A protein has these predicted regions:
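Solvent-exposed, polar/charged alpha-helical surfaces in well-ordered, non-transmembrane soluble domains
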Residues: 87-91, 95, 125, 151, ...
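Alpha-helix boundary/capping residues
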Residues: 96-97, 111, 130-131, 199, ...
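Beta-lactam-recognizing serine transpeptidase/beta-lactamase-like catalytic domain environment
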Residues: 68, 215, 222-223, 264-310, ...
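Short beta-strand scaffold segments in enzyme catalytic cores
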Residues: 259-262
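Conserved NTP-handling cores and scaffolds of large molecular machines
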Residues: 31, 97, 157, 443, ...
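Intrinsically disordered, low-complexity acidic/polar segments
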Residues: 85, 162-163, 536, 548-550
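Extracytoplasmic/periplasmic proteins that interact with beta-lactams or build/remodel peptidoglycan
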Residues: 1-257, 279-282
Length: 568
């Protein structure tokens, strides 16, 4: 190779090395600058805040009314990028709000934020006078009003408590979570977490900044309360907020512990469903240790198990009529307190009494005899057909309580007590409502339904939870005959306090004895439907530690019916 050729190769080699070096330096600069831009972009995003307490869809009634009672409240919002003397101005803001300045400084380091507490008129006036740049009073959507409805059903939110739950949330859906996020812990908030959780704010405020995080002159503060989040949905229930409100007002005035369920007659749709004692969902934001609160606060009494007492006699009456074992004028004997194996509540006894009178007067000895005639197998068959072994509620996947076992009716020495709704017989208020609905609906059993579907922001249902087809569990003729007998309960029997002028009612009382209650106290039931002809509402009232179904629950049934008819 000639010397001149070697020289050219050497020059070419070093030019190539130099070029590669320049490329590497440029790539490093790009990477470094990219990091800076990424950081600035992050800062840019940090100049926006969500003007909603929780980025979640709503849980609504059948008409789209929020059950949580959400509302807008003024909150102090701070945009640090607009503060021209951040240290002094944050200290001045802390003095006005009577809060910790260091805490405000720490929040400001993270970007824009709002202070989630009520704003007094005097404080608002001071803020207006101070005219701090970057400090604004903005309406923030609060999820819970002063009187949220159906809290045991809607459930509550809580922060992700553990890495285990965080991993589960991340792996079971398409939504992204951070440790410390607020998520559904119970009820519909829990069951529909993935559908309710939003991915972006529907209501927000922000300051436009460029890629380097500098304020863009001109637009100033921007507020949008109509943004669209396509990934958050609303849970649409079958609840009627008007009926639910009536039920809860009556309960708050009269029921310390118990449940009320209202169903649209001839369907399985639940119009109202409430339990007491109750709570306000914001308690979980205010109490540091939830374990210190009584467990009973959070039990959904409407889906909990209780002995039904004489309400269970409806099952025996339906079975006996359907099987042709009795007619309305079949006679029974009642010896009162001397009757065995189960005494009658009427100490002197009903003596010789017809089946019609026995149901109207809720005669225990008559139904014990009827239970023995039917036998455990047939009682179990009809109780199951009428829904007393099904805890399913469409759209509300509560776990099954395995203590409910109708087979126990066939156990030794159980048949007599079971015939009057004691012993091993356990039911939920929702099941009792569905039982009475099967009579009101001409012998058709409808599965209870609480959720009708999921809707988007426009109110359009994007997913439906259809009602199940009804099942004919007794003949229409039997349902008509039994309905007439239940009407008689409110005309001449122990349920007369459920009757109201001008509207005929059908129903049944129940008084279940519970170990541990004071003398004379029982779980008091009244379950019925109204009007007797062409029913519209089926209602169950349970008052724990009441005086008796006819004395305690029946008058509350009447009050709820009266008020429901007024708002139609």
């Amino acid at each position: 190779m000639l010397p001149i050729q070697r020289h050219r190769l050497t020059i070419s080699f070093w030019l190539l090395v130099l070029s590669l070096g320049l490329v590497l330096v440029h790539l490093y600069q790009i990477q470094l600058q990219g990091y800076k831009y990424a950081r600035q972009a992050s800062q840019m995003g940090a100049q926006n805040i969500a003007l909603e307490q929780f980025t979640r869809g709503e849980i609504t009634d059948r008409q789209g009314v929020s059950l949580s009672g959400g509302y807008y409240a003024n909150r102090v919002a701070v945009f640090p990028v607009l503060l021209d003397n951040q240290e002094a101005q944050l200290r001045q803001l802390a003095d006005i709000l009577n809060t910790n300045a260091e805490q405000l400084r720490e929040q400001a380091r993270q970007g824009a934020f709002y202070i989630d507490r009520s704003l007094a008129d005097s404080t608002f006036a001071q803020l207006q006078k101070a005219k701090l740049p970057g400090v604004h009073v903005l309406p923030v959507y609060q999820r819970y009003g002063s009187k949220p409805l159906a809290v045991h059903i809607t459930g509550q939110l809580g922060k992700i408590p553990s890495r285990e739950q965080y991993d589960r949330l991340q792996s079971t859906g398409s939504k992204t979570y951070l440790l410390g996020d607020w998520v559904g812990r119970t009820g519909l908030e829990y069951f529909y977490e993935q559908q309710l959780k939003g991915t972006s704010a529907k209501r927000w405020a922000g300051v436009p900044v460029d890629a380097r995080g500098r304020v863009i002159q001109g637009p100033g503060l921007q507020v949008d309360s109509l943004a669209y989040d396509p990934w958050r949905l609303n849970v649409v229930t079958t609840i009627d907020a008007r009926v639910q409100s009536i039920v809860e007002e009556v309960m708050d005035q009269n029921i310390a512990a118990g449940a009320v369920v209202v169903m649209r007659a001839g369907t399985g749709d639940i119009l109202a469903m409430a339990g007491r004692p109750g709570y306000h969902p914001e308690i979980f934001q205010e109490v540091s240790n939830i374990d210190e609160l009584p467990d009973e606060l959070f039990i959904d009494q409407s889906t909990a198990l209780f002995q039904p007492g004489s309400v269970f006699k409806v099952v025996l009456a339906a079975a006996a009529l359907e099987e042709g074992l009795v007619n309305e004028d079949t006679y029974f004997d009642c010896a009162g307190s001397a009757a065995r194996p189960v005494r009658c509540w009427n100490n002197t006894g009903h003596n010789r009494i017809t089946f019609r009178q026995a149901l109207a007067e809720s005669c225990n000895p008559a139904f014990v005899e009827l239970g023995l005639r039917l036998g455990a197998e047939r009682i179990i068959k009809y109780a199951a057909a009428m829904g007393l072994d099904r805890q399913q509620i469409i759209g509300y996947p509560v776990s099954t309580d395995t203590r409910q076992d109708l087979a126990l009716i066939a156990g030794p020495y159980s048949l007599a007590n079971s015939s009057v709704g004691q012993g091993p017989v356990l039911v939920t208020p929702v099941q009792v409502t569905a039982l009475l609905n099967s009579i009101a609906a001409g012998g058709n059993y409808y599965t209870p339904r609480l959720v009708s579907g999921l809707s988007d922001d426009s109110g359009r249902l994007v997913e439906l939870y259809d009602a199940n087809e009804p099942e004919q569990v007794i003949s229409p003729a039997t349902a008509d005959r039994l309905g007439a007998l239940l009407h008689e309960v409110t005309v001449s029997g122990v349920g007369q306090k459920a009757a109201l002028p001008g509207v005929e009612v059908a129903g049944k009382t129940g008084s279940a004895q519970v170990t541990g209650y004071a003398d004379g106290k029982v779980d008091a039931w009244f379950a019925g439907y109204v009007p007797y002809e062409n029913p519209r509402y089926v209602i169950t009232v349970l008052v724990r530690e009441g005086a008796g179904g006819g004395e305690t629950a029946a008058p509350l049934f009447r009050e709820i019916v009266t008020r429901c008819l007024e708002v139609e």
